[in-house]
Amino acid sequence: MTRTPVPGTRRRILQTAARLFKEHGARAVGMQQVVEETGLGKSALYREFTSKDELVRAWVAELHDHAWAQIDSAIARHEGDPARQLLAVVEHAQESTQDSDAHGCTFYNTSAEFRDPGHPGRREAVDHLERLRERLSALATAARATDPDALADMLMLIISGLYANAATLGPSGPAARSVAAARILIDQHVPAHVPTPEGRRA
């Protein structure tokens, strides 16, 4: 007889897994630990997620959606000024490291933990980072940067360095200079402009 899933079970599992993955790293946490922490039986867990790989993938996918909602919101605050929107992405990244419990960037961390290119969680993490790079390049193109792809790549390096430094040396260390570094970089690659309501240069 097939048991009917209890409403909220999937959410409960994901919330518990997210906490454990953040505290111990996704690779170090086993399915049995998730079972014990949720208080659910193994059958309930495996009914929602057929394997740990699938659980990690779902966790990263959920973080991906949450991160993009925040990035889109940061960008939307500077509509019509793509150069300022580029800086807003870095500002958002810096703000996200202010939490004293921050452990770096989940997407970079997951990619480092699961080295197999075919791992579902790693694929989700890499997809997020590739989309971020593409978004930065598109904004740089809209801002008429001299070399949009180069500017996007250098901003990606600032963002990754920001997360790494904030996690090790704290948000008040070198990470605190990330926005200033990004501003200098953007100013060097984007000609001076006056944004118009349509987002075009005057």
Residue spans of the language-model regions?
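Basic, helix-initiating cap at the start of DNA-binding domains
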Residues: 1-24, 28-40, 54-57
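Key DNA-contact positions within bacterial/archaeal DNA-binding proteins
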Residues: 43
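A short His-aromatic
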Residues: 46-49, 53, 113
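Alpha-helical DNA-contacting segments of helix-turn-helix folds
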Residues: 56-63, 70
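Hydrophobic alpha-helical connector segments
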Residues: 58, 72-103, 142, 152-155
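Amphipathic, non-transmembrane alpha-helical scaffold segments
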Residues: 60, 64, 122-130
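Amphipathic alpha-helical segments used for helix-helix packing
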Residues: 85, 99-120
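Hydrophobic/aromatic-rich alpha-helical bundle segments in the mid-to-C-terminal region
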Residues: 118-127, 141-202
